[in-house]
UniProtKB/Swiss-Prot annotation:
This is 4-hydroxy-3-methylbut-2-en-1-yl diphosphate synthase (flavodoxin). InterPro entries: Dihydropteroate_synth-like_sf, IspG_bac, IspG_bac-typ, NO2/SO3_Rdtase_4Fe4S_sf. [4Fe-4S] cluster binds at C298, C301, C344, E351. One of its GO terms (biological process) is isopentenyl diphosphate biosynthetic process, methylerythritol 4-phosphate pathway. It is an enzyme of class 1 (oxidoreductase). Belongs to the IspG family. Its EC number is 1.17.7.3. The lineage of its organism: Bacteria, Pseudomonadati, Pseudomonadota, Betaproteobacteria, Neisseriales. The gene is ispG. It holds the Pfam family GcpE.
Length: 421
C-alpha cells in the first residue's frame, strides 16, 4: 500500500474543522447567489453542504451583503447546518467589518486579497484593521493572492530590481515570485499585527496548470502555513475539470495542499454542486479521502453494443449519491464501498469479484444473464427486465448488513494512510 507524505504545517482550526498537516484535505466551494438575499444564499449553502462541501465562501462586497451575513448564519443553524462560512472581501472589507461587526462575528474565516486592499499607508491601515478584527474575533484568515489582482506596487518594485540585475529573469518568472512574496510578506505583517500563525492560510492562484504547480512548490518550501489550492479560473466543462485535476493531483501527490476548491464555470442549467463532486472525486480517486461509494464501470467496446450496462452504471452512481445523505449517518464507513458494473464476460467477472459488490452484464451474443458477486463470491444470477431494481436491492441490503450497528465493515477505513513530514 502506498503512503503519501503530507507537508508539515501549522494546524488551523476553523470551527469544528482542522486544516493542515495530517488533517484531511478539506473541500471548499463558493456561492454565486447575491449575498444580500439571505434566504437564497442559505439554501445554496445547504445544497453545497449536502453535496459534501465542508466550508463555503460567500461574497461580502456591499453594506447590503454584510448586513445579511449574520442572518445567513442563523438560517443555517436553524436548518441544522454548522458549515463554516468564509467571507470573501475585496476593496472595502475594512469598512464593512467596521460598519457591521456582527458580520465579522458570524463568519468563521476571512479571505483577504493583498492586491486590492489599497495602496501605500492607507492600504496598510485597511489591511491592519481587517487583521486586528480577525484576531479580536478569534477568526482564521486566508491571505489569497491572485495573478489577476497582484499588488502592482510590489510587482513594479520587483520588475525594476530584476531589470537592474546582472542576469535578469523573464518577466513571467518575476511575476510568479511576486505572488509568493506578496503572500509571505502579508502573512508576516499579519503576525506582527497580532494574528497567530495558526490562524493563517495562504494561497497564490493562477490560471495555468504549470504555473500553479511551480508557484505552489516554491511557496510550500518557504513557509509552514497551510495552503489552499485551486486555479483562479478553471473554465467550463471538461476543460475545467481536466485542468483542475491535472494541477491539483500533482501537488497533492507531493503532499502540498490542505484545502481545495474547483473553480468551474457553471454551464447553463448545471448544478453549482458540480465543483464539489469534482473535488471529492479528485481526492477519492487519489486515495486521500473517501466520500461516497465508487462505481467501477468499463468503457464499452464492440462486445457491448447495448447501452444497458451504461444505464445501470449511471443509475447505480445516482442512487448511491442520493442515499449518502442518509447512509452517512446510519452506516459509518459506507463511503468506502466499491461497486462494479461491467458490460461483458471479458473483464466483468474479474472486476466484479474485486469489488465489494459487482454485476457482470451480458455482452453482445452472450447468454442474457447477469451474475452478481458479493465479497468475491458469486451470489445470485439476475435476468429479465428488473435487473436494475433487483441489483439496487442487493446493494441496499449489503449496506445495511455490513455497515449497520453490528456490521463487519462499520467504520472500516480504506483510505491510504497519510503521514506528515
Amino acid at each position: 500500500m502506498n503512503t503519501l507524505q503530507r507537508r508539515k504545517t501549522h494546524q488551523v482550526r476553523i470551527d469544528h474543522i482542522t486544516v493542515g498537516s495530517e488533517a484531511p484535505v478539506v473541500i471548499q466551494s463558493m456561492t454565486n447567489t447575491d449575498t444580500a438575499d439571505a434566504k437564497a444564499t442559505a439554501l445554496q449553502i445547504k445544497e453545497l453542504s449536502d453535496a459534501g462541501s465542508e466550508m463555503v465562501r460567500i461574497t461580502v462586497n456591499s453594506p447590503e451583503a454584510a448586513s445579511k451575513v449574520a442572518e445567513i448564519r442563523r438560517r443555517l443553524d436553524d436548518m441544522g447546518y454548522a458549515t463554516p462560512l468564509i467571507g470573501d472581501f475585496h476593496f472595502n472589507g475594512e469598512r464593512l467589518l467596521a460598519e457591521f461587526p456582527e458580520c465579522g462575528k458570524a463568519l468563521s474565516k476571512y479571505r483577504i486579497n493583498p492586491g486590492n486592499v489599497g495602496k501605500g499607508v492607507k492600504g496598510d491601515e485597511k489591511f491592519a484593521f481587517m487583521i486586528r478584527t480577525a484576531a479580536e474575533n478569534d477568526k482564521a484568515v486566508r491571505i489569497g493572492v491572485n495573478w489577476g489582482s497582484l499588488d502592482q506596487s510590489l510587482a513594479k518594485r520587483m520588475m525594476d530590481a530584476n531589470l537592474a540585475s546582472s542576469a535578469p529573469k523573464p518577466p513571467e518568472e518575476v511575476t510568479k515570485e511576486a505572488l509568493i512574496v506578496s503572500a509571505l510578506e502579508s502573512a508576516e505583517k499579519a503576525v506582527l499585527l497580532g494574528l497567530p500563525e495558526d490562524k493563517i492560510i495562504l494561497s497564490c492562484k493562477v490560471s495555468a496548470v504549470q504555473d500553479l504547480i511551480q508557484v505552489y512548490r516554491e511557496l510550500g518550501s518557504r513557509c509552514a502555513y497551510p495552503l489552499h489550492l485551486g486555479l483562479t479560473e478553471a473554465g467550463m466543462g471538461s476543460k475545467g475539470i481536466v485542468a483542475s485535476t491535472a494541477a491539483l493531483s500533482v501537488l497533492l501527490q507531493e503532499g502540498i495542499g490542505d484545502t481545495i476548491r474547483i473553480s468551474l464555470t457553471p454551464e447553463p442549467g448545471s448544478p453549482r454542486t458540480q465543483e464539489v463532486v469534482v473535488g471529492q472525486e479528485i481526492l477519492q480517486t487519489m486515495g486521500l479521502r473517501s466520500f461516497t461509494p465508487m462505481v467501477t464501470a468499463c468503457p464499452g467496446c464492440g462486445r457491448t453494443t447495448s447501452t444497458v450496462f451504461q444505464e445501470l452504471a449511471q443509475d447505480v452512481q445516482n442512487y448511491l449519491r442520493q442515499k449518502m445523505s442518509i447512509w452517512r449517518t446510519l452506516y459509518p464507513g459506507v463511503e468506502s464501498l466499491n461497486v462494479a458494473v461491467m458490460g461483458c464476460v471479458v473483464n466483468g467477472p474479474g472486476e466484479s469479484k474485486l469489488a465489494d459488490i459487482g454485476i457482470s452484464l451480458p455482452g453482445t451474443g452472450e447468454t442474457p444473464v447477469a451474475p452478481v458477486y458479493v465479497d468475491g463470491e458469486r451470489k445470485v444470477t439476475l435476468k429479465g427486465d428488473n435487473i436494475a431494481t433487483e441489483f439496487l436491492a442487493i446493494v441496499e441490503e449489503y449496506v445495511k448488513t455490513n455497515y449497520g450497528e453490528n456490521g463487519s465493515k462499520r467504520n472500516q477505513n480504506k483510505i491510504i494512510p497519510i503521514q506528515s513530514l
